[in-house]
Amino acid sequence: MPNKLLIVESPNKVKTIQKYLGDEYEVKSSVGHILKLSTKGEYHLGIDFDNWEPIMIVDSTKTKIIKELKDAAKNADEILVATDPDREGEAIAKNLVDTLKVQDKYKRIKYNEITKEAIEYAINNPLEIDENLVKAQKTRRLLDRIIGFKLSELMQKKIKNAPTMPSAGRVQSIALKLVCDREKEIESFIPIKYSKIEANIDNFNNPTFYYKLANKDFDNDNTWISPTKIEKIYDDVKTNNKLKIIDIKITKSKEKQIIPFKQSILYKDAKYSSQIVQSSAQSLFEHGLISYPRTDSTRISESFIQKAKKYIAEKFGNEYVANDVKGFSGEQDAHEAIRPTNIELTPDFAKINYSLNEIDTYIYTLIYNRTISAIMATPIRETHHYDLLNKTATNEYYFKTSYSKLLFDGYYKVLGYPEMPSLIPNYQIGDYLDVNEYIRLDKQTQPPARYNDGSLIKKLDDIKVGRPSTFASTVSVIKKRLFVETHEDKTLHPTEFGKTVLEKLINGFPKTINEEYTAQVEEVLDEISDGKQDYKKLL
């Protein structure tokens, strides 16, 4: 009979962890939070304002689970609390220990991946509950209740006949504001018309290339021409159908190093909605295929890097191993980047042996390829830059173009190759090239792009609003409440209802509904997590 009880949050982890630990342990799940914030007390906020403590009650849906956990705890000599390694997980751990009354025989264990090695290491290196993390979660929860209740109360008074119950929250209001602000930018955008001239030239068996005008008399980026000047220039350029090569420069450059995924970048790069990506990543984590996905770190453990380097050397050769893996977060934060748990688990192998569906296979492949590419040598390209002269009877016009070729393919072996010409023409300075035709291109500047799920989450992350654990739910909530809608091209558009809600919020709470305030709150929550700030002071 088991004499040790290990408690996790998600029931999906139970079977895998039980398999690793054997009969000595009983693995059970709390199925998330077992307590919830009540609606008792002053203003129905569930807060004891005398000491700024939450009034917590048992979640009625968890009564049976709590009884089962209590019964299991009575028969166990040791309780291992293995909830997730973040603020929410720490709060759940604290509530479990207090509710089960096992303060004298519990151990807190944390792991970033569900593998036998990681679980055993966590068990052999137990911790205490981090009270600072618990305080940060408590502060975040109370803040969200105070602000959310008051904002929602205002909405319900100000907006009648709404399509959904008007409500608002600290972070979701900023997400709505970003979408509405971007829509205003687009609506007020005045396009600027401009023109370009390109020369079409045949180069042996190569595709047709275009040589862009580079006369500095025209504008800042050397290629735009105002519509008022284009006619005269275009007519003059066409009088000479030869371009003379006046300069050739050859440069070598390394491509940028790939940085491993943190959660917001995974959302941005994936082709699915944030909710689908979150669900898939969580499933991959629970099945032991990837590390903890709700992370804002780009750090990879040294032990994994060494294993990956060995794998890369064996599969591709020593020259494909990065000499120095730079660019990752250097601080020893609690989490790593999102990475595979085992570099040997290739996407094809994982798909077959773990019966991954199409979406999970896609997300795992993204994560696997991104990780291995981050530890591979960067590609090197050689670029040939050509300056060309069109000399007419009245003026001189300069054109430019460039060709690149790979000298070393590096991580492109995994990520795929960029489009490049099959060969670089053998031009010399002084050569004349025949122009088939000059092409006038009339264009106009474009407004900023609307957000989609991924780019909105990336923006929230960039301005330090919200946390990895809440990004997907934040976007989901503003959709469900009909504040924004997703169009066929996956872009987010504010509804008239959403615009009205934001207007009322800003008029009622101008200091709260702004990016700077919300980012400052996140900064203080981090300081509380680190024990550097008194949580009651913020509240």
Which residues make up each language-model segment?
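Core structural elements
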Residues: 140-152, 199-201, 252-261, 278-290, ...
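Alpha-helical scaffold elements adjacent to nucleotide-binding pockets in ATP/GTP-utilizing enzyme cores
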Residues: 16-20, 68, 91-99, 118-122, ...
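Leucine-rich, amphipathic alpha-helical/linker segments
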Residues: 318-344, 511-539
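C-terminal or mid-to-C-terminal helical accessory/interaction module adjacent to the motor/catalytic core
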Residues: 114-201, 250-251
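Accessory beta->alpha helical hairpin/"wing" motif in late/C-terminal subdomains of nucleic-acid enzymes
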Residues: 291-316, 473-512
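Intrinsically disordered, low-complexity regulatory segments
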Residues: 1-147, 224, 275, 436
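Conserved nucleotide-binding/hydrolysis micro-motifs of P-loop NTPases
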Residues: 11-14, 31-37, 85-89, 112-117, ...
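Long, highly charged, low-complexity internal segments
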Residues: 26, 35-60, 166-286, 317, ...
